[in-house]
Amino acid sequence: MKKIFLAVCVALVSLNASAQKDEQNIGAHVLYGTDAKNIGFGVKYQHNITYAIRLEAVGDYYLKSDGFTMFDVNVNGHYLFPIADKVKAYPLVGINYTHWKQDGFVTFDSEEQKEWWYEHDGSDGEMKDSSLGLNIGGGIQYQLTDKIRIGAELKYQTISGANTAVIGAGLTFTL
């Protein structure tokens, strides 16, 4: 009985020790989305709850292209696998909120048509939508210094009405 109690105590202490990573990072990245068909920029906050499990909050904004703009907010989970000295790979899963807007969706031949449309539709011919979706993908990171990492990531976002692949690269800084 004493051996079982000792084994349980050692297991609990080990579990607690592995959960004390508590590292926090902030970062910035550049990305390309296949649905936006343009580059975007983003910021992220990461929190390692264990040595292998990391939570991440991300905000991305895509530059306007042909009247189309988009931003998204993501919450992802990573499971880090050390694959070489200073290199880690990770799968990711998460959720996203995406908002997009297309200006000039309806074209007008005259000012009267535009006024009629605005009175009946309430918009200037723009179309916009917001939706929730899922993220699935993976990434790789390289530890440049004790405080700086570079990384690349590829994820697929399932968004109601439109799915998109997003590729990105950026830097993170340990706080």
What are these regions (language model features)?
Residues 1-23, 114:
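Cleavable N-terminal export/targeting peptides
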Residues 24-28, 55-57, 73, 89-93, ...:
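Transmembrane beta-strands of outer-membrane beta-barrel proteins
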Residues 25-28, 117-124, 152-154:
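Extracytoplasmic loops and strand-loop junctions of Gram-negative outer membrane beta-barrel proteins
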Residues 29-41, 62-70, 131, 157-167:
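Solvent-exposed loop/turn segments connecting transmembrane beta-strands
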Residues 31-33, 45, 63-65, 79-81, ...:
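Outer-membrane beta-barrel proteins
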Residues 46-114, 142-146, 173-175:
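Gram-negative (and chloroplast) outer-membrane scaffold detector with strong preference
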Residues 62-63, 143-175:
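Predominantly the C-terminal beta-signal and adjacent terminal strand-loop region
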Residues 113-127, 131-133:
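Internal catalytic-core helix/loop-beta-alpha segment
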